[in-house]
């Protein structure tokens, strides 16, 4: 029995069938599974501009495999384009909108399964949230990574352009060089090319078995990506027949596998937020502390941007995520019995993958010679982050810094100060009221961090925030500070010049002010008026949970 029988079977459903006949159904089609094709195609961003080709290939393949595909659209927000603007407040919000849209279309039409096609950062977790909520057979198709831009023999990504802004203000480059970077950073379709958020989340989804092997590192414009989309549709039809559902795959062990792979590839801090949200939706007991536990045992073995040398297409050519998983599996760092949407275990899928990466590449290192001996996403706690915070410490030359607080109430104020060269070596920059509630929307701080790096202060300044960081960020940065300032977190009590310690070795984020003084400040603090009271941002601020629990909107703290 199919779920779609509710709209296709029986005399009472004659009007329903009449509507379906108008969109291409014939007599023989009413017993076939109805499959949603959630198409994130958009000309807003290079991340999504190629998705229509993939969605149409999947649609065709689903029909040939015996399904009845029904295409519908989902939205996207371009993080790269909205970065540093008020529009960035809508980025994390779009994750919830995408999840709500897919859930609404699929459940509203009694669909039997869904294939979601996404590209930009929030497309992946948005689709996964919907899949976990609905628990109908599901497959995710990633739009693919952009190929690197080229300039002077060097690979460029969009982060190169952000860093160039800092370089021009510090006199390291001129406007002509800035324009050259701008014109060459993004050469075509695909998501941002380093191990930034989109590629991190696609790798996590592949690891958890809801997308096909090798698909998360394919280039958007290559033929194999379109072929993989078609194969994904065939797998979805089989999954409907076999009744393979997302919650069969999204187990505690699957999330641990995803975290292990994210550590191994040097992935984005945003993965912490998104995996916590997906796990909470799936009913899996995952906490922020699990990331620290796994970090302690899994090294970083991939030399990938933003802190490394290579981009995601290089990882693909070196063996992709299956090669990384094979190394972890052989070392006992992966649960090989986890199942995938193809009906096979990871042990089975990885059986023919070599136990060693190719000798003619430098992207994937053996575990005996890692980039870093432990994972790069550290969970820091202390009186500034009682619930926790997330620090990305790969490539950090100064993992411990105690310095004076430079306090800013918004990203814009901070960026202006950086570009005016008012931030000095040894400072601890604090950007607050940028959390899920306070922003609202938890903006990414790529513009300030890139400007700091561009001015040569990346190893000399710490930056902490209750907002987020782009997957392209590196340096001594600590985000997701919880509780956030807007709900009374200690970060809201910091004053200009206070001493703050950021210690990645001791996992400490501490405001060096005695408790008596903090109690006085807390008594004097009052909750600020919300920046938005209506529209989607006002609604989001009223509903959203703390970042330490994934910043979801459908489950109160």
Swiss-Prot record:
Pfam families: ILV_EDD_C, ILVD_EDD_N. GO terms for biological process: isoleucine biosynthetic process; L-valine biosynthetic process. It is an enzyme of class 4 (lyase). Pathway: Amino-acid biosynthesis; L-isoleucine biosynthesis; L-isoleucine from 2-oxobutanoate: step 3/4; Amino-acid biosynthesis; L-valine biosynthesis; L-valine from pyruvate: step 3/4. It catalyses: (2R)-2,3-dihydroxy-3-methylbutanoate = 3-methyl-2-oxobutanoate + H2O; (2R,3R)-2,3-dihydroxy-3-methylpentanoate = (S)-3-methyl-2-oxopentanoate + H2O. The active site is at residue 470. Gene3D superfamilies: IlvD/EDD C-terminal domain-like (3.50.30.80). Its EC number is 4.2.1.9. [2Fe-2S] cluster binds at residues 47, 120, 192. GO terms for molecular function: 2 iron, 2 sulfur cluster binding; dihydroxy-acid dehydratase activity; magnesium ion binding. Homodimer. PANTHER family: DIHYDROXY-ACID DEHYDRATASE DAD, DIHYDROXY-ACID DEHYDRATASE, MITOCHONDRIAL. This is Dihydroxy-acid dehydratase.
């Amino acid at each position: 029995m199919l779920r779609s029988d509710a709209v296709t079977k029986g005399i009472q459903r004659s009007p329903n069938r009449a509507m379906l006949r108008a969109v291409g159904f014939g007599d023989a089609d009413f017993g076939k599974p109805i499959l949603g094709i959630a198409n994130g195609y958009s000309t807003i961003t290079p991340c999504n501009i190629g998705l229509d080709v993939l969605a149409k290939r999947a649609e065709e393949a689903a029909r040939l495999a015996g399904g009845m595909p029904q295409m519908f659209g989902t939205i996207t927000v371009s993080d790269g384009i909205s970065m540093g603007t008020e529009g960035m407040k809508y980025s994390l919000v779009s994750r919830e909108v995408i999840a709500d849209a897919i859930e609404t279309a699929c459940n509203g039409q009694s669909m039997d399964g869904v294939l979601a096609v996404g590209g930009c950062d929030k497309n992946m977790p948005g689709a996964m949230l919907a899949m976990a909520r609905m628990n109908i057979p599901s497959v995710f198709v990633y739009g693919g990574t952009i190929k690197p831009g080229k300039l002077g023999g060097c690979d460029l990504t969009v982060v190169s352009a952000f860093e160039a802004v800092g370089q021009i203000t510090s006199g390291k480059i001129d406007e002509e060089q800035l324009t050259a970077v701008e014109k060459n950073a993004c050469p075509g379709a695909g998501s941002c090319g380093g191990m930034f958020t989109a590629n991190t989340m696609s790798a996590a989804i592949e690891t958890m078995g809801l997308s096909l092997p090798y698909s998360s590192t394919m280039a958007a414009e290559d033929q194999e990506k379109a072929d993989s989309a078609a194969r994904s549709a065939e797998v979805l039809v089989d999954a409907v027949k076999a009744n393979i559902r997302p919650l069969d795959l999204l187990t505690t062990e699957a999330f641990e596998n995803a975290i292990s792979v994210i550590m191994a590839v040097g992935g984005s801090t945003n993965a912490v937020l998104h995996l916590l949200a997906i796990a909470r939706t799936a009913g899996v007991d995952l906490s922020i502390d699990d990331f620290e536990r796994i970090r302690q045992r899994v090294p970083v073995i991939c030399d990938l941007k933003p802190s490394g040398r290579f981009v995601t297409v290089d990882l693909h050519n070196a063996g992709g995520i299956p090669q990384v998983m094979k190394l972890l599996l052989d070392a006992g760092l992966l649960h090989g019995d986890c199942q995938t949407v193809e009906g096979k275990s990871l042990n089975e899928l990885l059986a023919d993958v070599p136990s060693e990466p190719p000798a003619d590449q430098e992207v994937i290192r053996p575990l005996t010679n890692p980039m870093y001996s432990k994972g790069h996403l550290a969970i820091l706690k202390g009186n500034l982050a009682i619930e926790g915070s997330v620090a990305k410490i790969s490539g950090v030359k100064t993992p411990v810094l105690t310095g004076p607080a430079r306090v800013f109430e918004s990203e814009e104020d901070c960026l202006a100060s950086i570009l005016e060269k008012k931030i000095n070596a040894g400072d601890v920059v604090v950007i607050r009221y940028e959390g899920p509630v306070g922003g609202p929307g938890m903006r990414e701080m790529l513009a300030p961090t890139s400007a700091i790096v561009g001015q040569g202060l990346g190893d000399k300044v710490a930056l902490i925030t209750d907002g987020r960081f782009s997957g392209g960020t590196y340096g001594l940065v600590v985000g997701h500070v919880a509780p956030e300032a807007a709900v009374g977190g200690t970060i809201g009590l910091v004053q200009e010049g206070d001493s703050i310690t950021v210690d990645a070795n001791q996992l400490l984020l501490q405001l060096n002010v005695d408790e008596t003084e903090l109690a006085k400040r807390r008594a004097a603090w009052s909750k600020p008026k919300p920046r938005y009271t209506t529209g989607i941002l006002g609604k989001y601020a009223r509903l959203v949970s703390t970042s330490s629990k994934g910043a979801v909107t459908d489950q109160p703290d």
